[in-house]
Amino acid sequence: MTLTTHDAALQPGFMVVHGNRLEALRGLAVEWLRRHPLSPLENETILVQSNGISQWLKLALAENEADGGAGIAAALDVTLPARFLWQAYRSVLSQREGEDAVPPVSPFDKPRLVWRLMRLLPALLDAPVFAPLARFLEGDDDLRKRHQLAERLADLFDQYQVYRADWLDAWAAGEDVLITARGEARPLAEAQRWQAELWRVLREDIAADLGEAGLASSRAAVHRRFLAACRELDATNRPPGLPRRVIVFGISSLPAQTLEALAAVARVSQVLLCVHNPCRHYWADIIEHKDLLRAERKRQRRRPGMPADLAETELHLHAQPLLAAWGKQGRDYLRLLDEFDEQQAYRDLFEGEALRIDLFDSPLHHNAEPSLLRQLQDDILELRPLAETRATWPAVDPARDRSLRFQVAHSALREVEILHDQLLAAFSEDPTLRPRDILVMVPDVDQYAAAVQAVFGRLDPDDPRHIPFTLSDQASRHRLPLLIALESLLRLPELRLSVSDLLDLLEVPAVRARFGIPESGLPTLRRWIEGAGIRWGLDARQRQSLDLPGGMAANTWAFGLRRLLLGYAVGDAADGPWQGVEPYDDIGGLEAALAGPLVSLIDTLEAQWQTLAEPCDVATWGERLRELLAACFLAESDQDLMALTRLEQALDAWQESAEEAGLTEPLPLSVVREHWLAQVDEASLSQRFLAGAVNIATLMPMRAIPFRHVCLLGMNDADYPRVQRP
């Protein structure tokens, strides 16, 4: 079906627009939305890979029409591809098979697989095929290894369901093979056969618990049913849950399963993919060394002058080496897109409105100076090999060309200090440069947060050297005071509970509110604690649990509180020690009202210390942790209230997953703590980016967004690319 008229602008179809500049793709997407708006009560559905892209696109839509925007960014449903995909499954299959055709969650979802694997693994380790797992789990007294292994395996099988569903189908049929990209079946290596066997065990266990309906809820099974149902759809029977238009923007790669689903949805919806492609020529078979997969269909043409037939060993000699070395994901994605892209069906529609579907522009337009960075971008755009690059560009003068710079530092703090100095120099050289034009990316923002706060935060806002900044993408457990305090409380059985530990807790407003301690009372408490000789440890028993000899009660919190309370009781009448306790006499008057809340806090910590130290099942842990939240926190701000709500929701989800998995084994605090806090840190589209200051974030959410200055920290060989160890 060819779309050629103005009336066809919102008709169903699968349309792909390529471009080497994300700004150009954004401009086309905004222009398309402006020219072909949906009805007033319809939401636009936009799929993005991160909140950074989402914010950037919304800001462009909100620009005035004179500046290329739509004037407003409203009625937008911006979501992640996986979430949209599951919603599409439910919409289509519910119309065909009934409301319960696709459950809201599946036993094959990663959070539920974790606890099913936790239960199943111990019974499997005696089988010879699981010997590699048995070796890894040796000496696992605190179950930490088993939990980490279960998480990694659940993540692995979750990825297999998206990217290698054909492997899982073969394993479920009893075939220990791997299916290659050409469809060939190769035997699974002996050391990896446990994966196929474990998948079969998981399927049998789910079938025993939930029957065939449980197996039918796997992602691969639902996907097959969805594709079959979509073949029967047409424009007259579009499911009400499917949007009329779906825009996929700024996503660097999508799995074949998602592209299949989008192509199926395109039978009844308009699907527009804006693909960031750095090269105007076909480069899907220009690869490093011999990693060759040729494609029969190609949207783009080969670069003029390139031989039609290349030996595998010569492919990388006819292209820009960065594309050959680092472009594997992009090559695979372009090859997949070529399988679904029928450009002749929509090219006339775009050209009829003076729009292009191939938005490739040289970075050297308008006689721009050929800096080293622009040369590199143009080499990638034109697919120049190194020999041609040397002949094309003049030699670079390092003294004048500052487009690409490298700095070496001996520590993270020194890296940030150099960054701060470089940014001050950049602002001085270019008065038009603003803090929001600068992006700083790090592999792990939590490792650099303290250094950034120390360097960028040491100057007052009215200081001319002050640079406003925002730390985005930080883990909540390292950013929100309530969660930082909760993590400390969840370490009570292993915590020394020093004076600084307790005072850090009292710096948290929700803790002070729970025990009725005003912020103005903290200096008094510090004076009392120092005067009473308190150092660390709840009492002698808690110190003994940390492998110290019994009976060492001096300078504990119990020791100091006895001195404080005795001093308050006897006042000025104190005449030396009473029953071995020297009263602390600097307590009285209105200040004495703080003694009660301090005693209540210490009593609560002692009760929680005793409770948390004992392993128990998931249901009991749920009761304990809710009691901990109620006993130690009272939310007085919206942020604290939201944090407590998320903690409650994470507890509910954990208990539901463990109950479905049939896990009744007692779990230690270490496993519970890491899982609970990690769930609160799960990535979402609610994080704040592009707040008008220097943006400091991890590489993932911001890497595709263009900024005038891009800085990278932490590019150490062991940190990027990061090696994840089990």
Regions inferred by a protein language model and the residue ranges of each:
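Polyanion-engaging groove/track-forming segments
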Residues: 1-726
